[in-house]
């Protein structure tokens, strides 16, 4: 069981807001140390629990991701974990009405510029990601998965080929010296073999 310190707790009649601070452990994560807020509002006339993104959580603008266009960039696993935690709390207090959960990250829009999100068409903030709720030092795996997500998105839009460059120098050369569509470029870092394998 994970115990986290709560910050900025605010309780009103039908609403409660609190935040936790992300601990990325040994992972070199741009989101390390940021506050992630949850706002939970009672919706007595409903029986549904909903989860959405607020300020600093990105919105999907292109097809090919786990969420539909227009939805908050909250991946299925963390969304399911949030729903389960809220359902458990509602059961504990015998509450049977609806609840609206809004996740927000005040620094999210600024931090998102340092992530893959702009390339994936996620605008306005970061993505809420995860598979277990615990950060593991697996940056290499995370980068390869990010490349795979970007590739899948291109293919879902009907593109038949992609251009792979190791990094910024290759991307700059492509833009300045070759008559090729730059928007089809994917940066693969040192993972050329893995990228080719995923393309096959």
Per-segment meaning from a language model:
Residues 120-126, 131-200:
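A structural signal for small-residue-enriched, beta-sheet-centric alpha/beta enzyme cores
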Residues 1-120:
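Generic N-terminal targeting/processing segments that precede catalytic cores or assembly contacts
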């Amino acid at each position: 069981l994970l115990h986290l310190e709560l910050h900025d707790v605010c309780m009103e009649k039908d609403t409660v807001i609190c935040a936790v601070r992300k601990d990325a452990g040994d992972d070199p994560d741009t989101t390390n140390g940021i506050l992630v807020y949850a706002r939970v509002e009672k919706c007595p006339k409903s029986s549904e629990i909903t989860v959405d993104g607020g300020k600093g959580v990105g919105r999907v603008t292109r097809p090919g991701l786990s969420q539909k266009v227009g939805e908050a960039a909250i991946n299925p696993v963390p969304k399911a974990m949030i729903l389960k935690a809220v359902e458990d709390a509602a059961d504990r207090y015998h509450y049977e009405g609806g609840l609206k959960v809004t996740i927000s990250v005040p620094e999210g829009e600024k931090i998102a510029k340092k992530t893959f999100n702009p390339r994936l068409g996620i605008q306005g903030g970061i993505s809420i990601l995860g598979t277990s709720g615990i950060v593991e030092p697996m940056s290499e795996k995370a980068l390869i998965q990010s490349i795979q997500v970007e590739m899948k998105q291109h293919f879902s839009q009907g593109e038949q080929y992609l251009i792979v460059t190791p990094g910024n120098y290759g991307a700059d050369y492509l833009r300045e010296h070759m008559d090729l569509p730059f928007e089809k470029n994917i940066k693969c870092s040192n993972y050329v073999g893995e990228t080719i394998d995923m393309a096959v």
